[in-house]
C-alpha cells in the first residue's frame, strides 16, 4: 500500500510503501489527523516514520502499481 503525504509550504511529498489493509491505514491516519498528533508508520523494509500531522495538507492512500519495464508491447 502506498501512502503519499503532502505538506504545507513545500512542493516535496513523502511516499511510504507500507504493508497493511487500506481501511486500517486510513483509520489510523484519520485518527492522527483528528487529534493533531504524531503519526507513526512502518514501511515494507522495517523503517519507521514519524509524521507531524499539523503540517499535512493531503494524504493519498492506494495500492502500489507496478510499472512495466522494457519494450514489451511497444
Predicted segment positions?
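Short structural boundary motif marking the start of a folded domain
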Residues: 1-3, 37
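Amphipathic, hydrophobic secondary-structure cores in small proteins
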Residues: 23-30, 34-48
Amino acid at each position: 500500500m502506498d501512502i503519499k503525504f503532502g505538506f504545507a509550504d513545500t512542493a516535496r511529498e513523502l511516499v511510504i510503501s507500507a504493508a497493511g489493509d487500506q481501511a486500517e491505514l486510513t483509520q489510523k491516519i484519520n485518527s492522527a489527523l483528528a487529534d493533531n498528533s504524531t503519526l507513526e508508520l512502518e514501511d515494507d523494509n522495517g523503517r519507521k516514520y514519524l509524521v507531524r500531522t499539523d503540517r499535512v495538507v493531503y494524504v493519498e492512500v492506494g495500492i502500489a502499481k507496478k510499472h512495466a519495464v522494457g519494450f514489451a508491447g511497444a
